[in-house]
Amino acid sequence: MAKKSPLQKFLIVTSTFLGLFAIAVLIASPLAKYFLEKYDQYLFGREVTIERAYVNIFTGYVSLHNVKMSEAKSDTIFLSSVSIHANINRYKLFWREVEISRLTFEKPWVKFTQNKREFNIDDLIERFTPNKSPNSSSSWNVEFIGIKIAEGELHFIDKVIPIKYFIKEVTIEALGKLDEGDTIATRFNFLSGIGTGEMKGYFTVNTKSLDYHYDVVVEDYDLDIIRQYIWELINYGMFRAHLNANVKVRGNFNSQESMSGSGRLALNDFHFGKTTTNDYAAFEKLELVVEELNPAKKKYLFDSIVLTRPFFKYEIYDSLDNIARLFGKRGSNITDVTRQVGRFNLVIEVVRYVKVLSNNFFRSNFKINRLEIKDGNFKFNDYSLSDKFSIEGLPISLVADSVNKSDQRVKVVIRAGIQPYGKGSIQLSINPKDSADFDMDYRFEKIPVSIFNPYLLTYTSFPLDRGTIELNGKWNVREGMIQSSNHVVIIDPRVSKRAKNKDMMWLPMPLIMALVREQGNVIDYEIPITGNLNNPKFHWRDAVFDLLKNIFVKPPTTPYRLEVRKLESEIEESLTLKWEMRQSTLDKGQVKFLKKIDAFLKSNSNAVMTVNPVTYAEKEKEQILFFETKKKYFMLTQPQASKLLSLQDSMKVEKMSVKDSSLVRLLSKNISDTVMFSIQEKCVNFVGSKIVAERLDQLIKKRSVLFISYFKEDGTDKQIKMHESANDIPYNGFSHFKLGYEEGIPEAVRDAYHQLNDLNKRSIRKKYKKYRNAGPLVAN
C-alpha cells in the first residue's frame, strides 16, 4: 500500500473533521429538539413539545418554534409560544452553569393558577432558583441576563375566590442580570383583556435591598379584576370603574410606609350597587393630584382632591339595610375572609394599604390646596314603615380652599338642595391641628313637614297636610366640649284625617299638636346641646316651659287662632281640592265647596275657572299596590269571597296590614328575584305593575269626571278648563286639583285674603312672616 503524503493526510483529516462538523451542524437542531422533548421531565418537570428547533453551535443562538409546555403532572397547557429564542454561553456549560441572555418569548400565552397558597409555577421557581449551598456540586445553576416578552397574553386564575382575568398585547423587557445583589430594570406595556385600557411604565427593583422605583401611566383601564374580588365579599351586586393615572413612586418592599410618591390619579365611571342600573354608590370622577406623599416623613401634600357627581343611596328594609344585605350582618362576609390566615383578597389588601398610608394623616404635615365635592347626590329610603319614606340631597357641594395644617382655621362650606323641597347649608371653621376644635353654623329651610308623613302615619296614624320646617343652629366645640344653640320652627302645621291600618300605632296627634303648638300657630323650640362629642347632652328645659306656657297662656288667644285657621282653610279650599290617597268620592264639605263654585260661575257668566290636576303618582301607586296585594291575598285565602268585593270585605282589606306575617310568607315564597328586599318590590312581583298603572289611570279619570259632574246641571261646566293631570310631588303630600280664576276671584276669597293679611300683622304672627314666605299656604 502506497504511503500517503502529508498533504493527503491533511486533506483526509480536514475533510473528516469538516464532515463531522457539518454533520454536527446539521443534526444539532433536530438533536436539540429531541433532547428537550426526551428529557423534558428532567429539565423542567413538565412535558414539552416543539415543532421545530434551530441551534447555532458557533454563536450559542437557540430558537424554538411553536413551543408548548404543560402543567406539572397534567396535560393541560401552561405555556405556548410562537417562538422562543436566546443566546447561551457555551463556555460556562463546562462549569455546570447555564447562562441565558436575551431570552425572548414571541406571542406567548401563559396561564398562572393559584389555589390558596399554592401557585402552578412553584415547581419551576424551585427548580431554577440557584443553589447557594457551598456543598452542592451536582446541580446546575441557571442564570438569566435579560428577558423579553413580546405581544403576549397572560391569564390569571384563582380557584378559591374564583378569579379569571387576563391581559393582552403584553410587552415586558427586563434588562440586566437576574441575580441577587443586582438591580433589575423592567419596561412594560399591556392592554386590559376585559374591557378597555392600557398600562405602561418603567420599574426597577434591587433584589438585595428590595428598594423599588416605578413610573406608571394608566389610561382608561377597566377594573374588572376588582369586581371579581369584590364578589367574594358581597352577597350580590355589580361593580365597574376605570382608572387613569400618571404616578412616580419610590419605596421599599420591607416597609409599607417607606414610600414617596407624586403624580395624578383618577377613578372614573365608578358604580357599585344592586344591579348595573341600580347603584348604591357611584361617582363620575375622583381625582387626586399629589405633590408628595411620604408617610414615613409624615408628608401628605395634595394639590387637589376633587370628587365629581358622587351618589350614595342608603336603604332600610324590614330586615337589615342595603349595606348589611351586601356585606352580611355587621360585615360578616368581610370578617369571614380576613380571619383566614394567608387568605389574599386584592380589595382588602388595597384598603389595608390605604389605611397604613393615611394612619397618621392628621398628625402629619398635610396640605390640600383644593378640596371639592361637586354635584353630589345622597338618597335615603326607608321601607320599614307603613309607607315608603324617601328624601334626597341634590345637589350637594362641598368646598374647602387651602386645607393646610399650618393655618389656624380651615373653612368648609357645604350646600345642599333637598328633594322634593327645601335646602340646607353648613359652614364649618375647623382647627386643622385638632378635629375636635371647630365652629359650625347650619341652616335647613323650606322643608314641608308632609315629607315625614310615613313616620307620622306609622307611629301616630295621623299625617300632616300643611307645615314648613325651619332648622338652624350654632355649635362651638373646643377640645371636644360642645356649646350649642339649636332652633327648630314648624310653621302652620295641620293634622289631617286619621288613617286606620294594622301597620300603624296610634297617638292622639290633635291633642299633642294643641299642646306643642304656640300662639302664632307654630312649633318653636330652642334645644341647647352641651357635653362631650362622644356623650352629648340635650337640654329640654325650653321645650318643657313652652309646653306649660301653651297649656296656661294660649287659651285666651284661642278665638284669634280659630279665626286664622278658618280664613286659611277658606282660602285653601277655594284654591285647591285635596284628594286623600285612592279617594274617588267627595265628602260633604267638598261637595258644599263645589256647589259654592258652581253658584259663583252661574252668577258670573264671564268667569272662567282653570283646573290643573296634580297627582302624587308615586304615593298613589304605592297605596294602590298595597290594596291590590291585600285584595288578591284575601281572595286566595277566602274562597267564599266573590270576585267583586262587598263593602264589608273592602273594609277588611283596607284595614289589613300589608306586612301581615302570613301575607309576607306568601309574597316571599313567590319572588322571582332573590334581591327583592322591600315589601313594595315583593308586592309588584305578586300582582304586577300593569294592574297598578291601570288602576291609577282609572282613578285619575274618575276624579275628573266626578268633579265636572257637579257643574253640568247648571251648564257651568263650559266655564271650566280642565287640563291634563300632571305627575308631581305636592308640597302638602296629597294629590289635588289646583284651581285658578281667569276672570276675577270670588269675593269671599278676596275678603279672606285681606282679613288674613291683617291678622298676620299682629305681633303673635308677625315675627314668623319670613318663615311663612318660605312655604306656600297651598300646595304647588
Q: What are these model-derived regions, one by one?
A:
Residues 2-14, 293-298, 303, 359-366, ...:
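Extended terminal
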Residues 21-116, 144, 172, 177-179, ...:
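Terminal hydrophobic membrane-targeting helix
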Residues 40, 64, 84, 103, ...:
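Buried hydrophobic packing residues in well-ordered domains
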Residues 45-47, 74-88, 100, 161-173, ...:
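Amphipathic hydrophobic-ligand
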Residues 66-174, 274-395, 492-510, 533-547:
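Secondary-structure transition motifs
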Residues 126-160, 182-191, 198, 252, ...:
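Solvent-exposed beta-strand/coil patches in large extracellular/periplasmic or lumenal scaffold regions
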Residues 204, 217-219, 266-268, 308, ...:
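Outer-membrane beta-barrel pore domains and translocons
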